[in-house]
Amino acid sequence: MNFLTRRSFLKASAVATAATAFSARSWAQVPGANGDIRVAVVGLNGRGRAHLGSLTRLSGVRVVALCDADRDVLARAKANFGKDAAQIKTYVDLRELLAAPDIDAVSIATPNHLHALQAIWACEAGKDVYVEKPVSHNVWEGRQLVSAAAKYKRVVQCGTQIRSGEGLQEAVAWVKAGHLGKITAARGFCYKRRDSIGKVDGPQPIPASVNYDLWCGPAPMAELRRKRLHYDWHWVHVTGNGDVGNQGIHQMDVARWFLGEAGLPRRTLSVGGRLGYVDDGDTPNTQVVIHDYASAPLIFEVRGLPAKPGATGTDAMDKYRGVSVGNVIDCEGGSVVTSNYFTATASDKAGKVVKEFKGTDRHMQNFIDVMRSRKTADLYGPILEGHVSSALCHLGNISHVLGRGLSPEVLRERVKGNAPLAEASGRMVEHLGKNGVDLTRPPLVYGVPLTLAPKGETFTGEFAKDAAPLLTRPYRAPYVVKAIVA
């Protein structure tokens, strides 16, 4: 997939007729017949631009409205429609957009802390929804979104587009058919460079173009304590979920998909921290999360630091069996490796390739097709699957937040009884050593071991009382997610 930089987008937006990837021509609408599905895109930075690119290429679909709490971002997005711009309605407040009768669906690409609330609002307004991953900022609100989709009979697709590729669909079915024996471990990797976001001395100004009340939504309307309002919200717990819930949810979802596990694990444990620099972020940039499923362990790794200081190009990031961002599914008779979104390679125990799987991205088209058919069982990324995989990310972060720092020696002793965690955390410590990280300031955080109840998405055991409040959040009125009974 092509991810364009913010700089290139702003440059293109300055001159609407420029011959660039974000020229007016690229967002000209594909002609359709009567009965076009009318879509509004909500959140127009980053993934929102990708949504626009996908939607405007689909026949029988028209983007009719745009919404963003930042008026400058909104204006630039509208300008990119060129001659079609006059037909595009714009909104700063999503609630006004949802009151419009001439919109069939909304495509949500706002910050994580807004996803569930906005998707629930859309369901209540009778709109179908495509919502970016993670579908929630916490476990509880994700479950309310699942209930809202059922109660209001809406089509709700999660932005886990890897599930739409024929190649991965075939690979999952092939493994489940037993061609490599039972799965022994499902691994996901997010080795993706993340630089420091800087450290400020005091409150920063909110851009004049931003309606900060709407931007904050359910989160506290607090002073901005980082350089950038946009994007860097990922690295602050109050609005984001770190890379485990940003890039990582894709690979977390694929690992669970291969395992065939429909619900949450029996136990979850995290080891990690924000290491290598001191900045205004508070989410881990280095992390191992292990989910103890009955079938096999799901092991997930995040690394935001390079393979070694100064590393660039293809050698910039560590690789596990050739994978920086992807999955390794270990089985009794071999393994399946995915190193991009839509292809996979199966090998036997000797490393000989026995089968390859290739596919393409059909995710947005699938959403539109199901909107027309109303057969929600045909969704590739149904909201329930999106909720469960998002919850896996949240559980890892809950374990981390409640944990405490340990020296490498004590950590090694603590994890030695858990072979998969000991192996992964050992490699993590080695990686940090190559980056010159002093693991005494700050130390790695050994998270609390969380035990999940068999049903109900609640905790049991020693740390249940401390962990339970983190399944949800305090909501700022009027941006409150309420309990929904399907």
What kind of feature is each model-predicted range?
Residues 39-42, 63-67, 107-108, 130-131, ...:
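Structural recognition of the beta-strand scaffold that forms the well-ordered cores
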Residues 10, 52, 75-78, 95-98, ...:
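Non-transmembrane alpha-helical segments in soluble domains
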Residues 48-51, 70-73, 118, 141, ...:
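Stable alpha-helical elements in mature extracytoplasmic
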Residues 44, 164, 357-361:
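Generic alpha-helical segment signature
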Residues 1-131, 140-155:
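N-terminal glycine-/serine-/threonine-rich beta1-alpha1-beta2 phosphate-ribose binding loop
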Residues 73, 109-113, 136-140, 159-162, ...:
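Alpha-helix capping and helix-loop boundary segments enriched in small/acidic/polar residues
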Residues 128, 136-216:
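A contiguous active-site-proximal alpha/beta segment in oxidoreductase catalytic domains
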Residues 170, 182, 187-188, 196-242, ...:
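Contiguous beta-strand/loop segments that form the cofactor/metal-binding neighborhood of enzyme cores
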